[in-house]
Amino acid sequence: MIFGELRRLYLIIRVFLSYGLDELIPKTRLALPLRLWRKCLFWMPNCHKDEPLGARLRLALEQLGPVWIKFGQMMSTRRDLFPPHIADQLAMLQDKVAPFDGAQAKKLIEHSLGAPVESQFDDFDIVPLASASIAQVHTATLKENGREVVIKVIRPDILPVIKADMKLIYRLARWVPRLLPDGRRLRPQEVVADYEKTLLDELNLLREAANAIQLRRNFADGQMLYVPEIYSDYCSENMLVMERIYGIPISDVATLEQHGVNMKLLAERGVQVFFTQVFRDSFFHADMHPGNIFVSYEHPEDPQYIGIDCGIVGSLNKEDKRYLAENFIAFFNRDYRKVAELHVDSGWVPADTNVEDFEFAIRTVCEPIFEKPLAEISFGHVLLNLFNTARRFNMEVQPQLVLLQKTLLYVEGVGRQLYPQLDLWKTAKPFLENWIKDQIGIPAIVRALKEKAPYWAEKLPELPELFYDSLRQHKHLQHSVDRLTTDLRGERVRQHQSHYLFGVGATLLLSGTAVVLSRPEWDGLAAGLIAAGVVAWLVGWRKTS
C-alpha cells in the first residue's frame, strides 16, 4: 500500500477505536487474534464512553464519510440482525446526517446557477430541510410559477474522500481471493466496482433527475407510487430542483395509524411496487430505505407511496428476471430439482454441476425454512440461502443480483415494520405467476409482433427485391458449386492418374536396375526400362502440378 492508503487505513482504525467499536468484536476463540490486536493498540482509548453503543456506531460512520454512511443505511433496515437501540441510531443516517454550512450550500447553488439564488427562487431557507451522506436539501419557491420546491446540492469536497476509501477497499478486495478459499468465486473486485459505480452515479444529479423522470413516467397512470416532478431547466451535475412533497415518513408508524392508513394494504402495496418495478419495468428504485419513502396524506384507505432520491437504480435483463421469478415459484412449491436446474441453465453455476447433488444440498438447507409459517419467510433470506448453497458448487457472485437483494431486504424490512403479519409470498406469487405466463404465452407472441410491426412495415416493400436477389444469389451459388464439383472431380482423376504413373515409373526403374545388375549383356533392355520409368515419373509429376 502507498502512504496515502496506509494513512487512511490508520484513520479508519483510529475512528473505530476512539468510539469504542471494538466492543462489537465477538468473544469467541475465532476472534481472539482481533482482541489481541486491540490490546496492542492501547494508545487509542475509547473517547466516548458516555454515549450508548448505537450512537457511537452512528457517529463513527458519519465521521468516516459517505462510503461508510451508505453501509450504515443498509444495516439500518436489518432490524432482524440488530437490537432496536442500534437499528434506531443507524436509521438516523438516512436523513439526519450532520449538515454542512447553509451559507456554503447557497454559494454552491449560485455557482451551479451562474446567478444569485434570489434571481430564480423566493423564500430560500438557508437552514437545510434534510441532510444525508451525499447531499443536503434546502426549500425555496420558484419565481416563475410560485411552486414550492426543494433544492438538492452535493456536499463539497466529497469526491476525493469517496475515491480514497474505494481505492483502499479495492486493494483489500485484491487480497480476498488469496486469503479465503471461496474468495475467487465471490468476485470481490467486481462487487466493489459495482458499489463504486453506484456511489459515483449518486454524485451526478443529472442522472438522478433522469431516473426520477423515468420512474415518474412508469407510474404516471397508477395509484401505487407518486414521484415528484423534476424541474430540469434548473438541474446540473451538482444541483437538482424538484417539487416539494408533503407526506408521512414510512418509518413513522404511529402517525400513519393516527391518520387511519390501511396498514395491511400499504405493506402489500410496497411489495407490489417493488415487483412491478423489477419485472414489468426492468427499472427499480434501489435505495428504498425509510428516509426516501413517504406516504401521501390523501386517501388513507387507499394509500399511495411517495418515492424520492432516485440516485441509485437497478435493472435485470430478461433472462435474469425469468430465472429469478421461476426460482421463487419453484422454491415455494418445494421443487428443489427445478431450482437446481434453473441455477445451471442460467449459468449461475457451472454447466457440469451434478444436479442431483445440488438438489440435495438445496433441500437440506431450505427445507427447514418451511417449518415457519409462510408469512414469516423472508424473500431476501431465501435468496441468501440459495446463493450460499450454490457457492459450494462454484457459483460466482452475480453483481447484478446484489443490488436487487439489498433492495428486497429494504422492502421486506419496511413491509413487516408496517404490518408484522405481512405474507410476502401470498402477495408476490400471483404477480410472478402472471408475469411468467405473460412472457411465454400468446400475449408474449402478440406483444413481440407489435414491437416488430414497424420494422416489418418498413421491410415489407423490399421483400420482392430481396426474394429476387436471393434467387439470383442461389443460382450463382449453384453454378459455383457445380463448377467446384467438376473441378474437384477432375482433380481426383488427375491425382489417381499421377499416382498410377508414379507406381508404373517406380516399377520400370526398379526392373531396369535389376536387369543391369543381373544381366549386364542386356544393357539395351535395361536402358529402355529405365527411360520408360523416367518418362512415367515426369508425366505423373506434371499432372500433380
From Swiss-Prot:
Pfam families: ABC1 (PF03109). Residues 123-501 form the Protein kinase domain. It comes from the Bacteria. The chain crosses the membrane at residues 498-518, 521-541. It is a multi-pass membrane protein. One of its GO terms (cellular component) is plasma membrane. GO terms for molecular function: ATP binding; protein kinase activity. It is an enzyme of class 2 (transferase). InterPro entries: ABC1_dom, Kinase-like_dom_sf, UbiB, UbiB_bact, UbiB_kinase. Keywords: ATP-binding, Cell inner membrane, Cell membrane, Kinase, Membrane, Nucleotide-binding, Transferase, Transmembrane, Transmembrane helix, Ubiquinone biosynthesis. GO terms for biological process: regulation of ubiquinone biosynthetic process; ubiquinone biosynthetic process. This is Probable protein kinase UbiB. It comes from Erwinia tasmaniensis (strain DSM 17950 / CFBP 7177 / CIP 109463 / NCPPB 4357 / Et1/99).
